[in-house]
A protein has these predicted regions:
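Short, well-ordered surface patches within globular domains
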Residues: 33-91, 138-144
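Hydrophobic alpha-helical segments, especially transmembrane helices
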Residues: 3-7, 52, 133
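Generic alpha-helix initiation/capping and coil-helix boundary signal
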Residues: 3, 9-10, 62, 66, ...
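Single, functionally critical "micro-switch" positions that shape active/binding sites
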Residues: 26, 50, 127
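Acidic/histidine-rich, surface-exposed loop or edge segments in extracytoplasmic proteins
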Residues: 31, 47-54, 97-106
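A well-ordered secondary-structure block
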Residues: 89-163
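A short, structure-level motif marking secondary-structure boundaries and short turns
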Residues: 31-34, 116-117
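Secretory targeting and sorting signals
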Residues: 1-31
Length: 164
């Protein structure tokens, strides 16, 4: 009887633990791809909203710039670096005549939606002369955005490239 009780208690603890891990164990890092995708979409939308406010044409997604931005964001997150990519790399690999880049390192904030992070990032870029210049340049026609979380989970690394 005692063995049955111990087994039953052990099973309840195991099932409870699995349920807890299933509910709580999905951190933003584990749920990262969908959160990151929503943030990337939000960054493009926020950038276009801001560009429209200043009578600039909106930019459309470009798969080459997108892949390059995603790869660079992952590289920066994994290596704990915060530097711009050589623009010649983007110009050549994506066959473009003009390109600019904005990067950001944004602290993770529990409960903050991907859309809120995206809007806040664009708002902060608008407060910086160089980032603002890139964001409002009349030259770009296309955009690529990449987002990656640092291994410690403390930051989102954001890369936005716009080109012509």
């Amino acid at each position: 009887m005692r063995t049955v009780q111990h087994t039953l208690v052990a099973l309840i603890v195991m099932v409870s633990s699995l349920a807890f891990v299933g509910l709580v164990g999905v951190s933003p890092a584990a749920a990262g791809p969908s959160y990151a995708n929503r943030m990337e979409s939000g960054l493009t939308a926020s950038t276009n909203r801001r560009r429209s406010q200043y009578d600039r044409r909106t930019v459309r997604a470009n798969s080459c710039l997108d892949r390059m931005a995603e790869a660079w964001a992952r590289h920066l997150a994994e290596t704990n670096q915060f530097v711009h990519r050589r623009m010649s790399t983007l110009l050549n690999r994506c066959n473009r005549s003009y390109v600019n880049e904005n990067i950001a390192k944004y602290p993770t904030r529990p409960g903050m939606s991907a859309t809120e992070v995206a809007r806040d990032t664009v708002r902060l870029w608008m407060r910086s002369d160089g980032h603002r210049h890139n964001l409002l340049s009349r030259k770009p026609r296309v955009i690529g955005v990449g987002v990656a979380r640092t291994p410690d989970g403390d930051y989102w690394v954001i890369v936005e490239n716009m080109a012509r």
